[in-house]
C-alpha cells in the first residue's frame, strides 16, 4: 500500500523544521494528518486563455479543504503562441512545454505533495502538465480554463477567430477599417482560441484520456457552468487520493488511467474531430513519460480506420468549439466512436469506473438526464469580457442532428478516413503529418515544384513578395526541434498563402510545425529534420515533389542515386553540413542551445534525448 508522500515532511521528530515552515504557511496540527494536494495553476496576464485563472486556484483549494485535504497552490509559466508567432519569440514555445513539465515535477516532488489538480488551458501548458503528471504518477485531475467565445462582426456571415484576423490583414484588397474591425472582433473573451486549435484539441483529449471531467474541453470559459468543473475537481481529487493511499486502489494513478488503450482513444478522438497536428507531437511526448509504447506507426494505423465526424474551425467556418458543446461535447463524439466499435470503452477514468459507464450518463444520444441536457445547452453570450463564469446563456435546444449537424454519426461521416494523416516517403523516412480535414479534396494528390526557403522569415517574405506561384511547394527547413531551434509554428506562411488566393494551388512542407489554426495543404513534422540529416535538407529549387494523402506517401521525384550524391556533397561540407546556407539573423540563447542539443525529431515527440547523459 502506498504511503502518503507528505508524511516525509509532516511526521517524525526530525521533521520539526519542515513542520515549522508548514505552520508558517497556515497549517495546523490537524492539517498534518490530511493529504496535501498541489493546485498547479498557470495564471498569467500575458495570455487570454489564462488571464481569468487568477482566482481558479483558490476556488479549487476551498473545495479541497472542505473535502478534508490541504491545498497548496503554485504557478507555472504559460506562453501565448499567437503573440509569440511570427518572430523569434516562437523559438521558445515548444521548449516551454518541457520547462513546464520540469517546473511541476520540481515543485511537487520537492514538497512531497500527495496529488495534484492541474489548471491548464493553452497550447504547451496542458501537454507540459500531462508530461509531469505521467512522470510523477500521483493522483491528478485536469481542469482547463475553457474555450473563448467565437467572434462576430457585421462584415462577415461567419463567426470569427484569430486566424480570420491574420488572413484579412494580409489581404491587399482589405481596407484598414475592415482589418481593424476583424482585429477587434476576432477574440472577444477570455479563454483558449475558439476553434479546434491546439489548446482546445488538447483539452478535449484530456477527456478521452480519462484525466478530466466531462465538459472540460468544450464548456466556455465565460459560462457559469464551468465553475462546477473546478468545484467538482476539488472535491473529487480528495476522494481519489484517499482511495489511492488508504485503500490501495492503484488504478487512480495517472499511468494506470492513461494506458495504451487510453492513448489510442485520445488519438482516435483527435482524428475524428480533425484536431491540431500538434496533438500528435504532444501525445508522443506524454506517452513516453507514461512509459507507453505509442508511436507514429500507431497513429498511422488509426488514421486509416477512424472516420472524420466533425469539422470545426479552421477546417470549416461554420462551427467552433462552442458548437461542439451544443452537440453534446466530447462524450457525444466518443459515443459515436463507441457505436462504431472503434473506442476502448473499458478504460478507467477519474470520474467513472469505465468509459462505457461514463458514456451511459454523458452521451446525449443515449438517455441523458435533464441536468446533462441543460449542461450542454450552455452557449455564448456575445459580450466581450475577461471574467470567468460571467454569463449563463443557454441555447434553445441541443444539436442532435447526426446527419448534417456539427457532430456526425459514422454513417454520415465527412470521410471514412479521419482528419489527420501520417505520410512516409524518401523526403520523410520517419514520417510527417498533415491535417487532411483542412485540405481541399481537389489537392489531396498534388505534384508541384520545390520553392526552397531556409527559415520561416524567408518563406513569409517570398510569399508576400509574390515570388511563390501556383504549383509551388514551399519548403521551410531548418525549423525543426534542433534546427530552429524550437520547431516554430508556421501559421503566418499558411495564412498568407490563403491571403494570396493560393490555398488550393500551393503546398507548404516543413520540418517545423503548424498552429492548430492552420488549414490547407500544410505538411509538417518532417522527420528526420534537416538539422538531423533529413532528406528535406537535400531538396533543391525546382525539384518535383509528389504528395499523395490517400496513399499516405510523399516523395521528391529523384532517384536514390541522385539523393545519395547530394547527401555525400552535403557531408563533405564538414562543420557547415546540415545547416542553412546563409546565417540567419536569429539570436539563439544558451537556454535554447541546451534544448536543441538534446531535442529529438518530431516523430519522437521532440522530447529531450536523455540517453546522451545516461
UniProtKB/Swiss-Prot annotation:
Binds 1 [2Fe-2S] cluster per subunit. This cluster acts as a Lewis acid cofactor. Keywords: 2Fe-2S, Amino-acid biosynthesis, Branched-chain amino acid biosynthesis, Iron, Iron-sulfur, Lyase, Magnesium, Metal-binding. One of its GO terms (cellular component) is cytosol. It is an enzyme of class 4 (lyase). Its EC number is 4.2.1.9. The modification N6-carboxylysine is found at residue 124. Pathway: Amino-acid biosynthesis; L-isoleucine biosynthesis; L-isoleucine from 2-oxobutanoate: step 3/4; Amino-acid biosynthesis; L-valine biosynthesis; L-valine from pyruvate: step 3/4. [2Fe-2S] cluster binds at residues 122, 193. Homodimer. Belongs to the IlvD/Edd family. This is Dihydroxy-acid dehydratase. It comes from Marinomonas sp. (strain MWYL1). The lineage of its organism: Bacteria, Pseudomonadati, Pseudomonadota, Gammaproteobacteria, Oceanospirillales.
Amino acid at each position: 500500500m502506498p504511503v502518503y508522500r507528505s508524511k516525509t515532511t509532516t511526521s517524525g521528530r526530525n521533521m520539526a523544521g519542515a513542520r515549522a515552515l508548514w505552520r508558517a504557511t497556515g497549517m495546523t496540527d490537524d492539517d498534518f494528518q490530511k493529504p496535501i494536494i498541489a493546485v498547479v495553476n498557470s495564471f498569467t496576464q500575458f495570455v487570454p486563455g489564462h488571464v481569468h485563472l487568477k482566482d481558479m486556484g483558490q476556488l479549487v483549494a476551498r473545495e479541497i479543504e472542505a473535502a478534508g485535504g490541504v491545498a497548496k497552490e503554485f504557478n507555472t509559466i504559460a506562453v501565448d503562441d499567437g503573440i509569440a508567432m511570427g518572430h523569434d519569440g516562437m523559438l521558445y514555445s515548444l521548449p516551454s512545454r518541457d520547462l513546464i513539465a520540469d517546473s511541476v515535477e520540481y515543485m511537487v516532488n520537492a514538497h512531497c505533495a500527495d496529488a495534484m489538480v492541474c489548471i491548464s488551458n493553452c497550447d504547451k501548458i496542458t501537454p507540459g502538465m500531462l508530461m509531469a503528471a505521467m512522470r510523477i504518477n500521483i493522483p491528478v485531475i485536469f481542469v482547463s480554463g475553457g474555450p473563448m467565445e467565437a467572434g462576430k462582426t457585421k462584415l462577415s456571415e461567419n463567426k470569427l477567430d484569430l486566424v480570420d484576423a491574420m488572413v484579412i490583414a494580409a489581404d491587399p484588397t482589405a481596407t484598414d477599417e475592415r482589418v481593424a474591425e476583424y482585429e477587434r472582433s476576432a477574440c472577444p473573451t477570455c479563454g483558449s482560441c475558439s476553434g479546434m486549435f491546439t489548446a482546445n484539441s488538447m483539452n478535449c483529449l484530456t477527456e478521452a484520456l480519462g484525466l478530466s471531467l466531462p465538459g472540460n474541453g468544450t464548456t466556455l470559459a465565460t459560462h457559469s457552468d464551468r465553475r462546477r468543473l473546478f468545484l467538482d475537481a476539488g472535491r473529487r481529487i480528495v476522494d481519489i487520493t484517499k482511495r489511492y493511499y488508504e485503500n490501495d486502489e492503484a488504478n487512480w494513478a495517472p499511468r494506470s488511467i492513461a494506458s495504451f488503450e487510453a492513448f489510442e482513444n485520445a488519438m482516435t478522438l483527435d482524428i475524428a474531430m480533425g484536431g491540431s497536428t500538434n496533438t500528435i507531437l504532444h501525445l508522443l511526448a506524454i506517452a513516453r513519460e507514461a512509459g507507453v509504447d505509442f508511436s507514429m506507426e500507431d497513429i498511422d494505423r488509426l488514421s486509416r480506420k477512424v472516420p472524420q465526424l466533425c469539422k470545426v474551425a479552421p477546417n470549416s467556418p461554420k462551427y467552433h468549439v462552442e458548437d461542439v458543446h451544443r452537440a453534446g461535447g466530447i462524450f457525444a463524439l466518443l459515443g459515436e466512436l463507441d457505436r462504431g466499435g472503434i473506442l476502448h470503452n473499458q478504460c478507467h477514468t477519474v470520474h467513472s469506473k469505465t468509459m462505457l459507464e461514463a458514456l451511459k450518463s454523458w452521451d446525449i444520444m443515449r438517455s441523458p438526464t435533464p441536468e446533462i441536457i441543460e449542461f450542454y445547452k450552455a452557449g455564448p453570450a456575445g459580450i466581450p469580457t475577461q471574467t470567468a463564469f460571467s454569463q449563463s446563456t443557454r441555447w434553445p435546444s441541443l444539436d442532435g442532428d447526426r446527419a448534417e449537424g456539427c457532430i456526425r454519426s459514422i454513417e454520415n461521416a465527412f470521410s471514412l478516413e479521419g482528419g489527420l494523416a501520417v505520410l512516409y516517403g524518401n523526403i520523410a523516412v520517419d514520417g510527417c503529418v498533415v491535417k487532411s480535414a483542412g485540405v481541399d479534396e481537389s489537392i489531396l494528390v498534388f505534384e508541384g515544384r520545390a520553392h526552397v526557403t531556409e527559415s520561416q522569415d524567408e518563406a513569409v517574405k517570398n510569399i508576400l513578395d509574390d515570388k511563390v506561384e501556383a504549383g509551388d511547394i514551399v519548403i521551410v527547413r531548418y525549423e525543426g526541434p534542433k534546427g530552429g531551434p524550437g520547431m516554430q509554428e508556421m501559421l503566418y506562411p499558411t495564412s498568407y498563402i490563403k491571403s494570396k488566393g493560393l490555398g488550393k494551388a500551393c503546398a507548404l512542407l516543413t520540418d517545423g510545425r503548424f498552429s492548430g489554426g492552420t488549414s490547407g495543404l500544410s505538411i509538417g513534422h518532417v522527420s528526420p529534420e534537416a538539422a538531423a540529416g533529413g532528406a528535406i535538407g537535400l531538396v533543391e529549387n525546382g525539384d518535383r515533389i509528389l504528395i499523395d494523402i490517400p496513399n499516405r506517401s510523399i516523395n521528391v521525384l529523384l532517384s536514390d542515386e541522385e539523393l545519395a550524391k547530394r547527401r555525400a556533397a552535403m557531408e563533405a561540407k564538414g562543420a557547415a553540413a546540415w545547416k542553412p546556407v546563409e546565417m540567419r539573423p536569429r539570436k539563439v540563447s544558451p537556454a535554447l542551445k541546451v534544448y536543441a542539443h538534446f531535442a529529438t525529431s518530431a516523430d519522437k515527440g521532440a522530447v529531450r534525448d536523455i540517453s546522451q547523459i545516461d
